[in-house]
Swiss-Prot record:
Function as written in the Swiss-Prot or TrEMBL entry: Catalyzes the folate-dependent formation of 5-methyl-uridine at position 54 (M-5-U54) in all tRNAs.
Chief location of this protein within or outside the cell: cytoplasm
Name of the protein described by the UniProt record: Methylenetetrahydrofolate--tRNA-(uracil-5-)-methyltransferase TrmFO
Uppermost EC category: transferase
GO terms assigned for molecular function: flavin adenine dinucleotide binding; tRNA (uracil(54)-C5)-methyltransferase activity, 5,10-methylenetetrahydrofolate-dependent
Cofactor(s) listed: FAD
UniProt keyword list: Cytoplasm, FAD, Flavoprotein, Methyltransferase, NAD, NADP, Transferase, tRNA processing
Gene: trmFO
Localisation per UniProt entry: Cytoplasm
Family statement: Belongs to the MnmG family. TrmFO subfamily.
Record GO biological process: tRNA methylation; tRNA wobble uridine modification
Enzyme Commission number: 2.1.1.74
Binding positions for FAD per the UniProt entry: G13, A14, G15, L16, A17, G18
Catalyzed reaction equations: uridine(54) in tRNA + (6R)-5,10-methylene-5,6,7,8-tetrahydrofolate + NADH + H(+) = 5-methyluridine(54) in tRNA + (6S)-5,6,7,8-tetrahydrofolate + NAD(+); uridine(54) in tRNA + (6R)-5,10-methylene-5,6,7,8-tetrahydrofolate + NADPH + H(+) = 5-methyluridine(54) in tRNA + (6S)-5,6,7,8-tetrahydrofolate + NADP(+)
Length: 448
């Protein structure tokens, strides 16, 4: 397919990702047609017609460079992010986090984009993928059915799908490896899972805690997606004392290794129950809890799941969530610039690409917007270093295992490890990673 000869770029959706993409394109001197259906057609979760509206929390999370999202925000500031700039201008006290006056912030983003001389705001619902120009689609996790159908067809009918559950992901370095063992069920293939065995007593206590834990409330627009095919672990537990033993905690084929010295029920060779952890990234620094999609409150997840042997001190880089969410099979469909592999004139941004969170969504819009502009100018694509947060996030979502791909927040586990350095102190290690990231980003920008 040849490159479009249009004199403008389309951006569909004016959430965090679309707003950022539109600004980055216009900043580079290219006219933008920014489409937003709110004002013509409402959504269940938005309360206003403002751009970049925050529909849940007003927090952009931690602001320290020893926090991965704090590093990402600093990188975005250096890239002149409209979301970060207006967030700073509307900041409210929140301790070590960055929180904003949600209305003032959204109003200021809206005003800046509406008053930009190169941005034409069009309040209308888009139901077809435009073929008149380079286009960035940033329509969010609740993309309208009509447009979702078109994206589904574009991707061959199998690359755009609904998924409403995600299991917690933990930092491997915080797992007590003395209490777990590496094994695949029935020893099929390579030993690929970390197994957390439970005695009957441990399982009964865990079951009791799980069935009495407090769940997060569902929004009205989410209830329809609470279905049998993706049952939360706490719902499964409430169906019977042994239901989980025939599901994600099934011990069959996961016998203790000969050198196992932890607690066990008598001389049994197989644990009473097993929780499996599966590697979640290519670096092997992140593991998810297999089959543990959940809608428990985050504090309850930490309390209950830290009862699992080996996870007593586990750090969660992402808690489990249960919500309606549409996102793409990005590892098969997108490049690291969020460009479609099947239609090079098309970019995607925001949660539909598999990034999770306000800041991450805006960051994906920044990357997509810059690269849409570079494509328009027939310049080489800009891929940020994997040593940076803004480089590692698109790398993760476009190189993850497609079969088990789930949305991801930015975290230090997906950023390239330090080379030639082994820093035991976590704070010092994160500081070193952040220092390297900012230096590498500055070098990258200086070379442009």
């Amino acid at each position: 397919m040849s490159q479009s000869t249009a004199t403008y770029i389309n951006v569909i959706g004016a959430g965090l990702a679309g707003s950022e993409a539109a600004y980055q394109i216009a900043k580079r001197g290219i006219p933008v047609k920014l489409y937003e259906m709110r004002g013509v057609k409402a959504t269940p979760q938005h309360k206003t017609t403002n751009f970049a509206e925050l529909v849940c929390s007003n927090s952009f999370r931690g602001d320290s460079l020893t926090n991965a999202v704090g590093l990402l925000k600093e990188e975005m500031r250096r890239l002149d992010s409209i979301i970060m700039r207006n967030g700073e201008a509307n900041r409210v006290p929140a301790g070590g986090a960055m929180a904003v006056d949600r209305e003032g912030y959204a109003e200021s983003v809206t005003a800046e984009l509406e008053n930009h001389p190169l941005i034409e705001v069009i309040r209308d619902e888009i139901t077809e993928i435009p073929d008149d120009a380079i286009t960035v689609i940033a329509t969010g996790p609740l993309t309208s059915d009509a447009l979702a159908e078109k994206i589904h067809a574009l991707n061959g009918g199998d690359g755009f799908y609904f998924y409403d559950a995600a299991a917690p992901i933990i930092d491997k370095s915080t797992i007590d490896m003395s209490k777990v063992y590496l094994k695949s069920r029935y020893d099929k293939g390579e030993a690929a899972y970390l197994n957390c065995p439970m005695t009957k007593e441990e399982f009964m206590a865990f079951h009791e805690a799980l069935t009495t834990a407090e769940e997060a409330p569902l929004n009205s627009f989410e209830k329809e997606k609470y279905f049998e095919g993706c049952m939360p672990i706490e719902v499964m537990a409430k169906r019977g004392i042994k239901t989980m033993l025939y599901g994600p905690m099934k011990p069959v084929g996961l016998e203790y290794p000969d050198d196992y010295t932890g607690p066990r029920d008598g001389e049994f060779k197989t644990p009473y129950a097993v929780v499996q952890l599966r590697q979640d990234n290519t670096a092997g620094s992140l593991y998810n809890i297999v089959g543990f999609q959940t809608h428990l409150k985050w504090g309850e997840q930490k309390r209950v799941f830290q009862m699992i042997p080996g996870l007593e001190n586990a750090e969660f880089v992402r808690y489990g969530v249960m919500h309606r969410n549409s996102y793409m099979d990005s590892p098969n469909l997108l490049t690291e610039t969020f460009q479609s592999r099947r239609n090079p004139n098309l970019f995607f941004a925001g949660q539909m690409t598999g990034v999770e969170g306000y800041v991450e969504s805006a960051a994906s819009g920044l990357v997509a917007g810059i690269n849409a502009a570079r494509l328009f100018k027939r310049e080489e694509a800009l891929i940020f270093p994997q040593t940076t947060a803004i480089g590692s996030l698109p790398h993760y979502v476009t190189h993850a295992d497609s079969k088990h791909f789930q949305p991801m927040n930015v975290n230090f586990g997906i950023i390239k490890e330090l080379e030639g350095l082994r820093i035991r102190d976590k704070k010092e290690r994160y500081e070193a990673i952040a220092s390297r990231a900012l230096a590498d980003l500055d070098t990258c920008l200086a070379s442009l």
